[in-house]
Amino acid sequence: MKSGCGYLPSRSISRGRVFTVAKHLQRAGYCHGICTGEGLEIVGQGDCVIVQWDANSNGIWDREPVKESDQIGFRLKEHVLETLRGATSCEDKGWDKVTNPDAIIIDTFQVVRQDVSGFSPVLTVNMRAASKSEPQTVVDASYSVTGFNL
């Protein structure tokens, strides 16, 4: 196993980010009341996703204040994974970088929904990342969850 600075950080960062996105997907659609709209929106080829869930169990998907909104988005833009609390569109302004483009290059970020008749959908997050200092060091990470609330 390589111990160079490009290998372990990219591996742990990739897996950690994939797990974080997957946990948000697992919550998608939860509502302790009557919420309107879709709990999960997968855009494009799955390189952008917007998730809604009733985080405070007040029966609605809150949009305000933005810092406490029940929406969160993740997208791949210019080889960087970004996130935005309160996202309503993949084109919104103000997205924050989740990965450092000076250290990690994200080649692939994709969310895939697999619907199975009679069951909750399976949601899979796939990511491929490379160390900027060691581009030959590539890490593939994937994590699947069940969308029980969708």
Question: PLM features: residue spans?
Answer:
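Generic detector of ordered secondary-structure context
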Residues: 12-13, 66, 137
